[in-house]
């Protein structure tokens, strides 16, 4: 039988369990998932209905061939439709010319002209396409040049996670050569995303980034950006972890610091890792650290980072209606969202269509992630604590629907440490076993899946170097319940919400264009 709801007695919960970074790849080399001992997931894949889901490219609203990511994945899952992403929207606007007539970007340029000030372009300089894209930076530079700006400064945040760990050297060489041909554009600072894009309130990192931008104070100084990266490699730092470095002029002074009346365009379009630095610049009641200097700037966000801030947004979000959380709430169902810090925003904000609001009947549980520099040092992260809590909640009889994310395979996969990734996979498998048993006891069921791959490819198959980025591989989806489910059809992430509603015997709204994966007996 289907999952049925009895409002006057203990509920039999239906769970969506998202194993972040659990991709499917048949090759064993560099595959931490196949190298791990996973008796619980192996048994479920053998005995229960399963299928494959697409998590990348056009299947999730990204350009063809573009790997998926957690933000995109959870948006598609919660919306029950393909959500066209900011990367796609911005790319299209550049191609058709709308980008160069964007009123928000033009206002930032007008502010510079009015005050004879500087334009600062800051963000992740990467072709990864997860948080930003290099083509957007070059489009911004082109726009500034077309409008005759003479003082344009680039503050380079380096990737090393969504692209190989030392991909930045080539990208920075390309950018530096461009700047030398265009004297109105200069690179002013260089630093890894570990500092400029922290999202876990490790304010000491954000402060280092902020001080470099506003004070011209940083652990290192150098005469050019390429040297900054090369010297960091010599210190043993890879792109993500390159300490803030000031690029100096011929007299040894910073090329630029951010001053009053300047304009800033933060070119990242993904919000979660753009918020903390943005707060440091714009919040009156900011408490993360003491700001020695707070320049009064014209601050532009490429996309919406925080709906509570009244800031100009170059590409504002489209409003997603009738998302999974709202449909469940409108039906009077009680739902739980649970994850540790690293993925909490994904099972709440992103799953709710990029909205901060919490629906009626929606409980949220945040388990703190361990305070360590990189998660290869503790591959278990907080998975066991998440599991302890969710098992209690399952057995409480309170919840109709539970949505859970395990961060381990993705976050440890990003470190490039194969053995640590194997431990992460085994940790998650152990937790899956406990949760499935608790669901069985409670008469519940689960769909177990992932938002994108990662841990299944820990090694670059061409170079043998660590592979730290997401993959474009499909992911598995397993149904653990009993009843009349004969099989699952292959699909994409946007089919998960319609499938959950089908199991709950709730008609999907018209806005959900995904389909149920269920094949019934």
From Swiss-Prot:
Belongs to the BPG-independent phosphoglycerate mutase family. This is 2,3-bisphosphoglycerate-independent phosphoglycerate mutase. It is an enzyme of class 5 (isomerase). It holds the Pfam family iPGM_N. It comes from Methanosarcina mazei (strain ATCC BAA-159 / DSM 3647 / Goe1 / Go1 / JCM 11833 / OCM 88). Pathway: Carbohydrate degradation; glycolysis; pyruvate from D-glyceraldehyde 3-phosphate: step 3/5. Substrate binds at residues 131, 161-162, 193, 199, 270-273, 343. Its EC number is 5.4.2.12.
